[in-house]
Design a protein with these regions (language model features):
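Aromatic-lined substrate-binding rim segments of carbohydrate-active enzymes
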Residues: 81-188, 199-206, 210, 216-221, ...
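Polysaccharide-binding and catalytic clefts of secreted carbohydrate-active enzymes
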Residues: 169-358, 389-394, 401-485, 491-509
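Signal that preferentially marks extracellular ectodomain short beta-strand elements
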Residues: 376-389, 400
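Substrate-binding cleft of secreted/luminal carbohydrate-active enzymes
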Residues: 54, 147-159, 231, 237-238, ...
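The substrate-binding groove and active-site-proximal loops of carbohydrate-active enzymes
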Residues: 69-86, 113-129, 189-211, 456-472, ...
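Aromatic sugar-binding surface patches on proteins
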Residues: 361-382
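Boundary/entry segment of secreted carbohydrate-active catalytic domains
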Residues: 32-113
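Hydrophobic membrane-insertion alpha-helices, especially the h-region
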Residues: 13-27
Length: 628
């Protein structure tokens, strides 16, 4: 049985099921030029709402059977001049029946282009671009009168492309841990291909480039007024390093296995160190090693607790880069986003820092729905690189009301030296006065675990920095493809996650940090779920990031919001530099839901998950003309 085309994306917060997604394209007809609202001037100074509509399956791929009641849609999608424009316009008309020029936002759409799905296998076994499919995609841009974000995507999530199995059979296309090439994995109901980006000299990259070039060539044959509808191009989708057990392996537990340890990556790491330090003696001074040359350096790959090391610099685990998370959750009756509870951390009786209780914890809400709020998470990263070896005592307090501390618990941890000497308890200082938790407080300390040990290896942060640079280099390689085309002047964006907004995730596994910093010629594109969509955490990070303009490539508050609150969210992001905002929407033909594998995160009047039905209505009312 053919499965519906449903690539998925990694969402912040620990979801209980996978997002069945994909998007854009179905049914276009030139008659919609006169039925739809007139296009706005290019690059209007409004926030562009660019929902990703699940129209790929029924129109662009033509793999889904349409019910008899939608017989009139088929020819628009699949005819000689078929496109997804008719279904795009029908869906957007349901969201905004009449244009509203005075609105603070403009309504367009995102057209995702599944790069590896653009290939078909010939009778000779060779793979060629499906020109008909490319034509339907590009005609969508031509036939739909609205502004669009062109999303050129190829991620580790399967797009159910036939060529994927062929590419995965070549080890040079797959990411490698220290144990060798990663195979395929699963993320809930989606297949994961652990592609590498440590090199561009493989067939995976060649095919991606071939597909991008085919789309760009076709787009560049459009009339200038049609090309002008393209407000932005997003590159590849979520690009980050990978690890085994992708569904459950995002945290700090278990053996530390990350990509990429291929020969190309190891050679690249040595070049990276040579460029950074110049002389091997300088590297040796920094990391405390005795390498004779850069060619002797190997990436850290062993755990000192369980494996013999030839050099100490071979050690790696989730904490060897020099920080450890102190994290957990807390629910305080009466706390609000404006007046949150605070967590204070003390080390050996000395104050370390405090953090607001505000991070999303969908797992806590699922276990305790009576809280009615997922934003119960907290985390402080403790830098232990310069701490003396020995036993340290961490005490965690909750400040539920100003000045009133409640003691949540104590954790003894061992900061170890290279010789693994037996740690001794360090001197302690008096703790502040505190009271035991009352009935109005529920809380838990997730990490660190009692009596945990920590080893700092100064080579590990260099390894992670190199891995992060690999992400940037691969993005730049594909950015250059677009920059050489007729779309060179169209803004280009990343499409990245921000793993640090989930307090239970190890951001260094993903090594995504460098791609979130300002990149010459590439604007920030981020996927926001939960509190970062409407709360303060994302804007705090944005203020430190150096970014001035950005796109929101995926958006879901993970809770219902009324119209006024939704408008405030749109306005706030626009004030902070957001240029477009995309959320998933299910396709509707003349008001009826089009059958497909529906996305649990779609804003849709029939989807009650995460308040998505109410979010749809709120956006609908925000886009409606004011009542008279």
């Amino acid at each position: 049985m053919a499965h519906p085309f449903r690539p998925t994306f990694l969402h912040s917060a620990m979801m209980l099921a996978a997002a069945s997604v994909l998007l854009a394209g179905a049914g276009g007809a030139h008659l919609f030029h006169r039925l739809a609202p007139a296009p706005q001037a290019p690059h209007a100074p409004k926030l562009l709402l660019a929902p990703m509509i699940g129209v790929i399956e029924p129109c662009v791929l033509s793999t889904a059977d349409l019910p008899a009641s939608m017989d009139d849609l088929g020819p628009l999608c699949r005819g000689p001049q078929g496109s997804a424009a008719a279904l795009v316009e029908s869906t957007l008309k349901a969201l905004q029946p009449a244009a509203r020029p005075d609105a603070g936002v403009e309504l367009g759409y995102t057209l995702p282009v599944p790069l590896l799905r653009l290939f078909r296998q010939g009778e000779d076994g060779g793979w060629r671009i499906d020109d008909d499919m490319v034509g339907r995609l590009v005609r969508t841009l031509m036939d739909a009168p609205r502004p669009a974000i062109l999303y050129l995507f190829s991620t580790h999530f399967s797009s159910q492309a036939p060529i994927e199995e062929t590419l995965a059979a070549d080890p040079s296309n797959m990411g490698q841990t220290r144990d060798g090439p990663l195979g395929m994995d699963d993320y809930y109901d989606s297949k994961v291909f652990n592609w590498t980006f440590a090199t561009t000299r493989n067939t995976l990259t060649e095919r991606r480039v071939q597909a991008v070039q085919a789309v760009l060539d076709a787009a560049c044959r459009m009339a200038p007024q049609d090309r002008a509808k393209i407000r932005g191009v997003t590159l590849l989708g979520e690009l980050h390093h990978l690890f085994p057990n992708f569904q459950a392996g995002m945290g700090f537990d278990g053996p530390y296995r990350v990509t990429d340890y291929s020969a190309d990556s190891v050679a690249g790491f040595r070049r990276y160190l040579r460029q950074a330090f110049g002389r091997i003696e300088q590297l040796n001074r920094v990391v405390g090693a005795d390498y004779a040359s850069f060619d002797e350096v190997v990436p850290p790959s062993r755990d000192i607790r369980f494996e013999p090391l030839r050099r100490y610099t071979e050690h790696i685990d989730a904490f060897a880069q020099g920080t450890l998370p102190v994290s957990g959750w807390a629910h305080v009756e009466g706390a609000t986003a404006r007046h949150p509870a605070w967590v204070h951390v003390y080390r050996n009786g000395d104050f370390v820092g405090r953090t607001a209780v505000r991070w999303g914890r969908q797992d806590v809400l699922a276990a305790k729905p009576e809280f009615g709020d997922a934003n119960t998470g907290w985390r402080i990263d403790l830098d232990f690189k310069r701490l003396p070896a020995g036993l340290h005592r961490l005490d965690v307090f909750l400040e539920a009301s100003p000045g009133a501390l409640t003691h949540l618990g104590t954790r003894d941890i061992a900061i170890m030296d290279r010789q693994q000497s037996t740690p001794r308890l360090l001197p302690q200082h008096p703790l502040p006065a505190a009271t035991p938790p009352g009935a109005a407080v529920q809380a838990h300390i997730d990490s660190p675990q009692p009596n945990a040990s920590y080893y700092y290896n100064p080579l590990v942060p260099l390894w992670h920095a190199f891995r992060a640079q690999q992400v940037v280099d691969y993005l730049r390689f594909f950015d250059a493809q677009v920059a050489r085309s007729c779309l060179r002047d169209v803004p280009r964006y990343t499409h990245q996650i921000i793993p640090f907004t989930n307090p239970s995730w190890d951001a260094n596994k993903f090594a995504i940090q460098a791609s979130l910093r300002p990149l010459d010629g590439i604007r920030l594109g981020v996927s926001l779920y939960g509190e970062p969509t409407y709360g303060q955490s994302y804007f705090d990070w944005l203020a430190r990031s150096g970014q001035s303009r950005y796109g929101i490539t995926e958006f879901h508050p993970l809770k219902a919001m009324d119209t006024a609150a939704m408008q405030q969210v749109f306005e706030r992001h626009a004030r902070h530099g957001a240029e477009f905002l995309s959320f998933f929407v299910e396709p509707r033909w003349q008001g009826a839901l089009v059958p497909r594998g529906h996305n649990m995160f779609s804003f849709d009047p029939d989807n009650a998950q995460f308040g998505s039905d109410r979010l749809y209505r709120s956006v609908q009312r925000a886009l409606a003309p004011p009542a008279r």
